[in-house]
Amino acid sequence: MGNPKAFLNIPRQEAGYRPIHERISDFGEVEQTLNSSERKLQASRCMDCGVPFCHWACPLGNRPPEFQDALSNGKWREAYEILTRTNDFPEFTGRVCPALCEKSCVLKLSIDSPVTIREDEAAIIEAAFREGYITAKQYKRNGLKVAVIGSGPAGLAAANQLNRRGYQVTVFEKDEYIGGLLRFGIPNFKLHKPVIDRRLKIMEDEGICFKTNSTIDLEHLPEGFDAYAICTGTPEARNLNIPGRELRGIHFAMEILAQQNRVLAGQTFSDEERITAKNKKVLVIGGGDTGSDCIGTANRQGAISVCQIEIMPKPPVGHNPATPWPQWPVVLKTSSSHEEGCTRRWSLTSNRFLGTEDGRVCGVEVEEVEWIPAADGGRPQMRPTGKKEIIEADLVLLAMGFLKPQLPGLPQNAVVAGDAATGPSLVVKCIAAGRRAAAEIDAMLQKGSH
């Protein structure tokens, strides 16, 4: 802790986003970066608290006070080494993590100005790549083989940890590229795909084998492996089964997001296959991060208008007494995509889709709802109000979350990790789950070898 009063004298400075008029014309990453000296100043704001709630809040158990201290003193390599003891892929979390740590920072409580932990993390790992700190290493092999099914953040973390422990790791991916959610679920304007490829090259050089276009039947796992890490994610989206669902122009969010990422990777689609918001009135049903990603994608594709509706009530602004510090605050969040242009509405349920004579969607009948608090403090009860209206839309994107998969019975040497085990969560939680799965497999196989 170089300057114990830095948090009093140095204000929080975020790198911010590229100008809206510039960024909506491309799919480049929207977030900017600070220079090295500014980043060191931001790191110096960390107070090295006696009880580091930032560490408590991080699913990975990252140690922000330690890497912030190194960074503030210009020890970039040391900061990188501290960071990667607990996080396999800071370049992913540094871009897309909601920064649970920052909401639990003591400076968030005291002056509502937490340390820029996520941005500092991203700066550290990018400096490590730039300076050549990250090179492929070779690990002594133990003669055992592990198959990882799925190449999202949980699968990649499990593979990375198992490989470092000496196992011969093969990763099976059903799609044509490695990355899972990182590759196809997160827009390029949040996570540039060469960032993934850069990491995959290192993992391949370290001995991990990747097999794409490999759909694995979990009831018939591939033979020849001593253990399996099942990291297949949550591929099934929550549907909206109301009248008119069969109309053309209604798509799951992942359909447009994955297709747009494939287009940016050079894949072509026929006019009939292509899902585009160009010159359309877009309605996004669902108020979470996936819905936000749909908004950003629709605006970049040239939508006439974008409206996002959410069945839940509008969250409080700034502070919510129901989720006090150091908990994750359930408050109104405005993403970079929201800033780019959309109408947001809450407490609306969808009753039916309306269509044209030729079978295309042209609107949605919605109804205002009220949420009645439960007497026992549990989930509030939804009550329709009878106030109905039509929202015009010729492209409807369903972003209402994903369903936890129902997995078949698995052999004792199989460990399930990530969203496949818990249902939909965060990239940071999936990386943590992949690391735990690797440790569990290692303990199981080492016990069996004695």
Show which residues each predicted segment covers.
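Residues at helix-coil transition
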Residues: S72-N73, R85, T422, Q446
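Residues forming the flavin
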Residues: M1-S37, Q42, E121-H450
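Short helix-capping and inter-helix turn/linker motifs at the boundaries of alpha-helical repeat units
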Residues: A57-C58, V96, G341
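Iron-sulfur (Fe-S) cluster-binding segments and ferredoxin-like electron-carrier domains
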Residues: N3-G28, F53-E78, L100-E126
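Immediate flanking context of iron-sulfur cluster ligation sites
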Residues: P4, T33-F53, W76-L100
